[in-house]
Amino acid sequence: FLNIYSFIIGSFYNLKHLGYYTQADKWSKMGITALGQILGSSFLPILADMQDNRERLHRAISKMNKLTSFIIFPIYAGLIIVAEPLFRTLFGNKWDASILLFQLLIFRGIFTTLTVFLNNCILGIGKVKIMLYLEIVKDILSLIAIFITLEMGVTILVLGQVFVSILHYLLMAYISG
């Protein structure tokens, strides 16, 4: 299910659109994945130690969420702002159509990184089964978003992806407390 958007774009649009999306997706995931893994591996052991003290755990989750937001918002906002000159410097004008997609995917990355953090919170409090259900819900929401936005173009399709990431984050935030 990880590559469904590439599959959909490749199947319903032309290869040029797939190339633009792939370029934007590849570059957006580099920083998002690295930052998410660093934060996740740092916080999970701490949360696991607090599993038996719910009040202390919720305070720690709140502080860690604020710290995560404090770190990622400026980084991702900066990437969104410098996307155009960055792409033009690295790739020239031939990938200009990837810039908006990159910016949208970086915006999605804010919620993706926060969701990775909340995944660790849910694992830290021992609610492992809920993770499976949340992934199923996210996949269903993704399919609905694809179905609704498919005929509207690649940019709107990516906006649907962003919307699903926001909804998934909100569900995770609600469940993690």
Question: What is each PLM-predicted segment?
Answer:
Residues L2, D25, G40, L100-G126, ...:
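Short runs within selected transmembrane alpha-helices of multi-pass transporters and secretion channels
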Residues A24, S28-I72, L118-G124:
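Helix-loop junctions and terminal segments of transmembrane helices
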Residues I8-K29, H58-A60, D96-F102:
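Interfacial/gating helices of multi-pass transporter permease domains
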Residues I4, G31-A34, A77, I110-L114:
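Hydrophobic/aromatic residues within the transmembrane alpha-helices of Major Facilitator Superfamily
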Residues I4-I9, Y13, Q23, L39, ...:
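Hydrophobic/aromatic end-of-helix segments at the C-terminal termini of transmembrane alpha-helices
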Residues I61-T113, L143-E151:
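Alpha-helical transmembrane segments of multi-pass membrane transport and lipid-handling proteins
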